[in-house]
Amino acid sequence: MPKRTDIRKILVIGSGPIVIGQAAEFDYSGTQACLALKEEGYQVVLINSNPATIMTDKTVADTVYIEPITLDFVTQILRKELPDAILPTLGGQTGLNMALELANCGILAELNIELLGTKLSAIDQAEDRELFKNLMNQLNEPIPESAIAHSLDDAQEFVKQNGFPVIIRPAFTLGGTGGGIAENAGQLKTIVKNGIALSPVGQVLVEQSIAGYKEIEFEVMRDRNDNALVVCNMENFDPVGIHTGDSIVFAPVQTLSDREVQMLRDASLKIIRALKIEGGCNVQLALDPNSERYFIIEVNPRVSRSSALASKATGYPIAKMAAKIAVGLTLDEIYNPITGTTYAQFEPMLDYVVAKIPRWPFDKFNKGDRQLGTQMKATGEVMAIGRNIEESLLKAVRSLEIGTAHLELDGLTSVSDNDLVQRIIHPQDDRLFYLAEALRRGYLIQELAELTKIDLFFLDKISHIVELEEQLRSEKGDVELLEIVKKNGFSDEKIAKTWQITPIQVRQMRQESGIQPVYKMVDTCAAEFESQTPYYYTTYEQENESLVSAKPSILVIGSGPIRIGQGVEFDYATVHCVQAIQKAGYEAIIMNSNPETVSTDFSISDKLYFEPLTLEDVLNVVELEKPEGVIVQFGGQTAINLAAPLEENGVKILGTSVANLDRAEDRDLFDQLIQELNIPQPVGKTATNAPDALTIATEIGYPVLIRPSFVLGGRAMEIVHTPEDLTHYMQEAVKVSDEHPVLIDRYLMGKECEVDAICDGQEVLIPGIMEHIERAGVHSGDSMAVYPPQNLTEDQKAAIIDYTTKLCLALDCHGLLNIQFIIQNDEVYVIEVNPRASRTVPFLSKVTQIPMAQLATQLILGSTLAELKSPTGLLPAGPLIHVKAPVFSFSKLTRVDSLLGPEMKSTGEVMGTDVTMQKALYKAFEASGMHLPSHGNVLMTVTNQDKAQALALAERFREVGYQIIATPGTTQQFKAAGIPVQQVDKINATSGDLLDKIKAGHIQLVINTTGLNEAPQVAKDSIVIRQTAIEHGIPLLTSLDTTDAILTVLESQSLLTKPL
């Protein structure tokens, strides 16, 4: 059936900020869908609150709204735009829940707007646990015994009949939020209460646990003529019980018989047909390893994280197809864009193995709860392609960028047998490495299968890797063995370490023996048809399928997996860089390892290499392609760290030179530069050991800011107030800095500002200055930023422009440079210079309308600002005010302290834009989920040094209609100043516990600040207060500057009531 002509304008709902469970995969699917709809001639309107995405670029949709995805704002846009239809299935859980809200409030019926792709009834049937259960019973598809619970009593009733363990799944939530496995009454109470609180409909499913079954996923598509197909099937390495987003996954399935695959395939197609979904859908199934018994776990009636993985694993662009099906096209009318000759109704076939490994944030949150279960904790993921499981698994391990190139971790060899077994039974993020260690110690795969319920087949593959390690040790220098281990994914680094030579010597040995990697194409059809796509992976075989073109090329290094500190912003910059390279007439080649992103969409670049971002893998691509040069500015710290080793191996780095990158990153060289330019900076020195550090800190004077050099996202950064704290930090953090010294600076309390500049070596363009709302001491990635700045004097701006220009020219910068400043007592200090694209580039590009990454790329390729007729100096600001606000994922990460400081903790960002500061702030808070009622109770527990400032804020809260609740110390001070306060006892007191007040919903906002030199009990209590607020979804502020900003919003909305 041809596409529909009765609709013209379509609204696409984006997925909002990146949080755990909903990351860059929705930027990828949303971008694909918008472009596909435009390709078919429809007018596309997009709403998304996340400025760091490609999909919010003006070129992706016809009209782009960066506004909060809330009922009020979306309704306002619907009334203004009057679209014919809405496509909600590409914006993750956010998009689906929004579609339901819009339907339920009646606006869609009123404006006669149709829902495309998946009907409301299907969304309801898949997401509402009770309707889903009824549908499965009608279809005669088995699901685990379960009951819907709206209260703890309901859940206890089910357990009485069915016993423990049970799995609890809240309805309409994302990434398993609020769910878990309960093995006893205590756990049941905690998880059920939490789950009901976090479910938007106050409903959880309690089901008999099938933990230990094999977890299988089918990614299926269907069109309106009822054609349906399986795009990809995937098998979780970890059994049921660990969220699929936290599982290692292989595609295609590895351990099932043909009969089992067929059985699960039939069930998946039966379900998508019964739900009448038009587009993509993900079905999760559990298979009993000892029989052919299976259960349906759940169905996602939308494009998901798994569909991004399936798209990249097969080359079949699911989101693009889903968008075309949504407007009436059928699978037998749409061409498969990879082959260009076959239609989309052919099921992809794979002649390789894909491995996905999640990337967790525990390198930043070393106190976080690392236990894996039904609630997702990973921030991102990597994917690798190989000809066998060993190869794809080891390639994926080295893509993670966690400091290891093999199945080994520091300190594993010294773990006791007892601890080893415990870590294998109770899975954490690093279980894979413990399994390998157990096999090295002689444990049998049968024993490990018994303990973990992981299939023997997978354990045997790890065992094979361990056997090859053993052989490597005993047969040093054996060329035949070298070829075997390379075919099994071993890195040159691992071989070098075992043979006690350097990786470059291993490389030379390989080259002399003709053991060279070849590149194979991802073509959706196992080489059955001719393919058009330039999408490749390496392996050690005979025939190379990647043909080098005669056109000069540029290689761009991507930013790898999404993690805290290095998010989708860097992918945004990478994609823009590629677009500029293509416009300049070069062939653009991307190398990256992240399946969720736009940059790894094969249609973006001229060639895509899906490979780990390590020196060995990049050199392999460089040797084949012989590009004009490599660009490292846009891939975050991942790419910058490769610059020097690449240059040492004769690779040309484009843009700012490696020597100048080093001058910005190396502390001593940077200090020299700052002194030469006569630019003020906080007093600071470097130390390589604890005694040095103590001496320096005493000289400079406490408090000091201490951090390792060469880091991103403030990794292991702290403000230290006492020598004891410093000693403790040196024991913890110097381990972090491997051979790099730590930097110790005088900590300045002041206003923080930030600049992204673009330079061609002669002239400098400063698109804008951003002012942070939070004072120095909160990481810039966790601060709210305002553009244009609201509180800078002309003199301060002039100093910022002067220092920026001097630094750009002194570093002979070609491309982008990010500088952070502190202003204290009217003096402007430089605190940090990053010679690369920073995480503020997308935000600043959107608000200034300067395509910064593209412009920077043109300069990297040799153009000048003058030739491009670009303005220079500080650009004049427009009439609107823009606020960028961070978004956190603390509700997914138990035991991670939500107190903001110099270590970055946010996972995503939103933006609010309006004509006044108050309105822009209001939008930013709304978009980030921080919605405050106009009145209520605010709990204030603040540290002594904050009490004076808190007093003024408390008075303002009273004025707008809030009642103040405080602990005894704060109450005393407030009462003395004449502010009415309700006192609550501290946590350890016996009566009227303040935690009960939070749990019972009596408190609408918690403000909690702690000093670093608090008494241990006070600090502990503060953590419990913050954790309780997060668990119960109560807005929490840990900075008085943010509190001041929220008050500004509340004041602007409250009407004056004053007696005559």
UniProtKB/Swiss-Prot annotation:
Q: Enumerate the spans annotated as MGS-like domain.
A: 930-1060
Q: Name one GO biological process term.
A: 'de novo' UMP biosynthetic process
Carboxyphosphate synthetic domain as annotated region, ranges: 1-401
Q: Provide the binding site for Mn(2+) 3.
A: Q820, E832
Locate the residues binding Mn(2+) 2.
Answer: E298, N300
The residues that hold Mg(2+) 1 are Q284, E298
| Protein name as annotated | Carbamoyl phosphate synthase large chain
**What does the domain comment read?**
The large subunit is composed of 2 ATP-grasp domains that are involved in binding the 2 ATP molecules needed for carbamoyl phosphate synthesis. The N-terminal ATP-grasp domain (referred to as the carboxyphosphate synthetic component) catalyzes the ATP-dependent phosphorylation of hydrogencarbonate to carboxyphosphate and the subsequent nucleophilic attack by ammonia to form a carbamate intermediate.
What cofactor does this chain's UniProt record say it requires?
Mg(2+); Mn(2+)
Where does this protein hold Mg(2+) 4? E832, N834
Which residues take part in binding Mg(2+) 3?
Q820, E832
Q: Which UniProt keywords apply?
A: Amino-acid biosynthesis, Arginine biosynthesis, ATP-binding, Ligase, Magnesium, Manganese, Metal-binding, Nucleotide-binding, Pyrimidine biosynthesis, Repeat
Source organism lineage?
Answer: Bacteria, Bacillati, Bacillota, Bacilli, Lactobacillales
Q: How is the cofactor bound?
A: Binds 4 Mg(2+) or Mn(2+) ions per subunit.
Where in this protein does the record put region Carbamoyl phosphate synthetic domain? 547-929
